[in-house]
Amino acid sequence: MARNEIRPAVKLRSTAGTGYTYITRKNRRNDPDRLILSKYDPVIRKHVPFREER
């Protein structure tokens, strides 16, 4: 199978509304739902939840 099918690149957008994004890869078999990760948002200088954007 192609690499892109198993581990697609996804954008994680800040829930703080700053528009800051991270780009990462996820495994669809382990995480079929949207990812929500706590990451650092340098715009507001805090750790906030980042949600997968579709």
UniProtKB/Swiss-Prot annotation:
Natural source organism: Mycobacterium marinum (strain ATCC BAA-535 / M)
This protein's record includes keyword Transferase: no
Stated name of the protein: Large ribosomal subunit protein bL33A
Alphabetized UniProt keyword annotations: Ribonucleoprotein, Ribosomal protein
GO BP term, pick one: translation
A Pfam family it matches: Ribosomal_L33
Domain of life: Bacteria
One GO CC term, this protein: cytosolic large ribosomal subunit
Family: Belongs to the bacterial ribosomal protein bL33 family.
Annotated PANTHER family: 54S RIBOSOMAL PROTEIN L39, MITOCHONDRIAL, LARGE RIBOSOMAL SUBUNIT PROTEIN BL33M
HAMAP family: Ribosomal_bL33
Molecular-function annotations in GO: structural constituent of ribosome
InterPro entries xref list: Ribosomal_bL33 (IPR001705), Ribosomal_bL33_CS (IPR018264), Ribosomal_bL33_sf (IPR038584), Ribosomal_zn-bd (IPR011332)
